[in-house]
């Protein structure tokens, strides 16, 4: 059992590890056993959080030219549909290089606009890099290997996830931006947000809110160094209230259009189960701007806001400005005019291109 805990709200909560970590560990173990001709029971991997995991290897299967094994997903106290699921990797020797494939129970992306290209297995960018890094660390220099990730119960479990709504078929996604699962109970998460805001407010007169790791990466990659970033998950309204309670009057919110656009409709909890109006916001603005209804329908047919942005291309800067201005207006109303707000809105997971920055923003000055 993974022995890492966080404390929140007076409760001790156990962390877990992602399907991405499981896939990377299984792939590394299978590769090691294939080329060293011996079984092992535990494998160590690193994670993007620089936390090392020592994971127990299960169900080793040796064939003529390949070896496969599994790692059991442990979600800690954040038990979701994939917790307890076996994530397998099969390693086969090839002439040279590294290849990564998706097998049984790993979903296939069928729509544009996700973080993985259409037709590819639903193995997200960070897990892909983790798998490659760990495999290459044990692959002999003069050898090549093909890794196939497969999840025997993946097709069944995927029905309990959001994959069907996203156009990901026939299995689960291999996910995780940090490699670690932190307990996400609402009470615990809100308390941790409140504590971080209070801590950051001690030495800062302004705060920057991001929804998750991607938002923070967006800032750091552009040279932002101040220690005033708070990850607020989906709790925009709650976080604003906490900041105001600490006397913070200047707030910048940095986020993907899929999150920020919801605020334009007055949604201050941006979780998809609470508010899912991303496409409607874009469609409404296009309609108000006088664009053809055929284009509006195409936007509404997309699975994600990412897909809508890619469909529209780079010819709609006024659209994002209008959405941004409505977000700012909603924020001002929510805070009763007691704070100054700025926003930075982007799209993409790798390129993370800026769509809109409010006029008074000075994060990079």
From Swiss-Prot:
It catalyses: Co-precorrin-5B + S-adenosyl-L-methionine = Co-precorrin-6A + S-adenosyl-L-homocysteine. The keyword Transferase applies. It comes from the Bacteria. Its EC number is 2.1.1.195. Keywords: Cobalamin biosynthesis, Methyltransferase, S-adenosyl-L-methionine, Transferase. InterPro entries: CbiD, CbiD_sf. Pathway: Cofactor biosynthesis; adenosylcobalamin biosynthesis; cob(II)yrinate a,c-diamide from sirohydrochlorin (anaerobic route): step 6/10. The keyword Methyltransferase applies. GO terms for molecular function: cobalt-precorrin-5B C1-methyltransferase activity. Coiled coil: none annotated. GO terms for biological process: anaerobic cobalamin biosynthetic process; methylation. Pfam families: CbiD. Belongs to the CbiD family. This is Cobalt-precorrin-5B C(1)-methyltransferase. It comes from Clostridium perfringens (strain ATCC 13124 / DSM 756 / JCM 1290 / NCIMB 6125 / NCTC 8237 / Type A). The lineage of its organism: Bacteria, Bacillati, Bacillota, Clostridia, Eubacteriales. The gene is cbiD.
